Curated annotation (Swiss-Prot):
GO terms for biological process: adenine salvage; AMP salvage; purine ribonucleoside salvage. GO terms for cellular component: cytoplasm. The gene is APRT. The modification Phosphotyrosine is found at residue 60. Homodimer. Disulfide bonds: none annotated. It comes from Dipodillus campestris (North African gerbil). Keywords: Acetylation, Cytoplasm, Glycosyltransferase, Phosphoprotein, Purine salvage, Transferase. Belongs to the purine/pyrimidine phosphoribosyltransferase family. Pathway: Purine metabolism; AMP biosynthesis via salvage pathway; AMP from adenine: step 1/1. This is Adenine phosphoribosyltransferase. Catalyzes a salvage reaction resulting in the formation of AMP, that is energically less costly than de novo synthesis. Its main location: cytoplasm.
């Protein structure tokens, strides 16, 4: 990985203690989005990883609602691919399939349009951050319902202490930056 580019990305992640609740250290990507050079570097680094690992064997990038939408289309463009959207329940028109996942208090659902992917198509799921892995795991299950193949999940930031990568089981996972 290009170390100067990775440092450029890392310098644009801010930390806010005790947000949104006491005891949480929030990782803010807003400065990265404000800086076109840092944002381009993050996309280039993710794209280079995917090219080296999968070559031309990816059909689509799937962006997760909502901050995965910030990275998904740009990553797809960098790779010459299309991007499909995985949304929170009730946000997509037409026939959809859904998958539930647990939240701290209750549950949530993700949806994708039934015709978004064909069986056997190879997909990379992208989000800004992996924490507990609940959302990413639900996205993998959702694409499984369409019989698409999730070849990898990627994120800009991974909070390693929350062990979200373990929830993904055998699905490969990659992150640019890791924090406790």
């Amino acid at each position: 990985m290009a170390e100067p580019e990775l440092q450029l990305v890392a310098r644009r992640i801010r930390s806010f203690p005790d947000f949104p609740i006491p005891g949480v250290l929030f990782r803010d990507i807003s400065p990265l989005l404000k800086d076109p050079d840092s944002f381009r570097a993050s996309i280039r680094l993710l794209a280079n990883h995917l090219k080296s690992k999968h070559g031309g064997k990816i059909d689509y990038i799937a962006g997760l609602d909502s901050r995965g939408f910030l990275f998904g289309p740009s990553l797809a463009q960098e790779l010459g691919l299309g991007c499909v959207l995985i949304r929170k329940r009730g946000k997509l028109p037409g026939p959809t399939v859904s998958a539930s996942y647990a939240l701290e208090y209750g549950k949530a659902e993700l949806e994708i349009q039934k015709d978004a992917l064909e069986p056997g198509q190879k997909v990379v799921i992208v989000d800004d951050l992996l924490a507990t892995g609940g959302t990413m795991c639900a996205a993998c299950q959702l694409l499984g319902q369409l019989r698409a193949e999730v070849v990898e999940c990627v994120s800009l930031v991974e909070l390693t202490s929350l062990k979200g990568r373990e929830k993904l089981g055998p699905v490969p996972f990659f992150s640019l930056l890791q924090y406790e």
